[in-house]
Design a protein with these regions (language model features):
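Short, well-ordered amphipathic alpha-helical segments that serve as non-catalytic structural scaffolds
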Residues: 26-41, 61, 65, 90-93, ...
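Glycine-rich loop/linker segments at domain edges
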Residues: 16, 96-158
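Condensing-enzyme catalytic core mediating Claisen C-C bond formation in acyl metabolism
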Residues: 1-24, 207-263, 267, 271-275, ...
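Active-site pocket-lining segment
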Residues: 249-318
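N-terminal extracellular/periplasmic Venus flytrap/periplasmic-binding protein-like
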Residues: 11, 23, 28-31, 164-245, ...
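Conserved beta-ketoacyl condensing-enzyme motif
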Residues: 22-85, 89-92, 97-98, 104-106, ...
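Active-site-proximal alpha-helical scaffold in enzymes
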Residues: 80-112, 155-185, 237-242, 322-343, ...
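Conserved catalytic cysteine-centered active-site region
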Residues: 53-104, 142-146, 203-229, 302-334, ...
Length: 367
């Protein structure tokens, strides 16, 4: 089997719903990243482009992205939909193809535009009726709030308090603001004139968060104060058989009860650590996609001694969660955390709608 390395990668600044990328189609965001990677790695012959996307217009939007870029039309492209875990799935397929010797160099990641998410309509003969923005994730539910309800169930199961949830939101924004001020993430963000990570808030407080009403009624916990908003962005990485700065050691994929989908980030992490025979104390930088604050609470419940190495630059509560590319953003952030920390091992994990989860372990080469 072939060792798989990450040569590098980039993401766009992440835009809020209907803000800086309100009218920009996601394939153009993706093409901008592909063009930057082509300039950065001009000698790499690309065998495939694998693109995650969750709420786009359908078709093979990854191929459209490739055709809009400076890469040759002879480079194939595939689109993957695993909802929140789409980019992680794309990276996983790229990892597997290179490891099996089927490809040598693959660009993988994802694109998303919540701002341009189309309204879909069920066919006349479908037993489901009407129009929808949110797809059906499990056989027994067509609820558009399925992910919110999942976060609420996990919050209740682990007896999380509202104060805990607020504290994690505040931590995420504070870390992200510090990273912004120090330029810690600048090496992995494509410079786009007039664009920035729009979600970061420097002036928020628990008092302000407490004014935001819960989504599922007065006795519930989940609200916009402890959930990520909807966003636009793109992120891709170049995976290769050639030695690079980071090696992908292994990955894990899991599935479980869709009603408790946030838990799958923990289960994916646990499976991966068992596969590689490591404990969390061996990991120098950890990224979980914090679509909800309860995911941070899960980390603290299971790994209380490792919180200081968790989401070093803040997470999706601050930056946002452009579903189809979040997994690639997580991997880029953990790579940058390893550079800053001068660490060896990095782990990132993400849960997805429908009760799925994916995790990756990477190693900084030469450490």
């Amino acid at each position: 089997m072939v060792d798989v390395y990450i040569q590098g990668g980039l993401r766009t600044p992440i835009g809020l719903f209907q803000k800086q990328y309100a009218s920009m189609r996601p394939e153009y965001l993706g093409a901008a990243i592909l063009n930057a990677l082509k300039k950065r790695y001009p000698e790499s012959h690309i065998d495939d482009i694998i693109c995650g996307n969750a709420v786009g217009t359908g078709g093979n939007i990854g191929r459209l992205t490739g055709l809009l870029s400076d890469y040759s039309e002879a480079v194939p492209a595939t689109t993957i939909d695993m909802q929140c875990a789409s980019a992680s799935a794309a990276l996983g397929f790229a990892f597997a193809k290179i490891k099996a010797g089927l490809s040598e160099n693959i660009i993988a990641g994802g694109i998303e535009s919540s701002s341009l998410q189309p309204l879909r309509t069920y066919a006349d003969k479908d037993d489901r009726t009407g129009s929808y923005y949110v797809a059906q994730f499990s056989p027994d539910s067509t609820d558009s709030l399925a992910m919110i309800r999942g976060a609420e169930r996990v919050s209740q199961k682990y007896q999380v308090t509202q104060k805990e949830l607020y504290q994690w939101t505040l931590k995420s924004h504070a870390k992200a603001q510090k990273a912004l001020e120090t330029g810690a993430l600048s090496p992995i963000i494509l410079e786009m004139p007039g664009k920035k990570d729009e979600g970061i808030r420097s002036k928020i407080s628990e008092k302000l968060l407490s004014r935001i009403p819960p989504i599922l009624g007065p006795d519930s916990l989940t609200s916009a104060a402890n959930s990520c908003l909807t966003h636009d962005g793109a992120a891709f990485l170049l995976l290769s058989h050639q030695v690079g700065e980071f090696k992908i050691c292994d990955m894990a994929q899991v599935a479980g009860d869709p009603r408790f989908s946030p838990e799958l980030v923990y289960k994916a992490t646990l499976k991966l650590l068992k596969k590689v025979n490591l404990s969390m104390s061996d990991i120098d930088a950890i990224e979980w996609n914090e679509a909800f604050s309860v995911i941070d609470c899960l980390f603290q419940r299971y790994f209380p001694e490792d919180v200081n190495r968790y989401n070093l630059f803040g997470g999706a509560l601050a930056y946002g969660h452009p579903y189809g590319c979040s997994g690639a953003i997580n991997l880029l952030h953990v790579m940058q955390a390893l550079r800053v920390q001068k660490g060896r091992y990095g782990l990132c994990a993400i849960a997805g709608a429908g009760g799925v989860g994916i995790s990756f372990l990477i190693e900084r080469v030469g450490v």
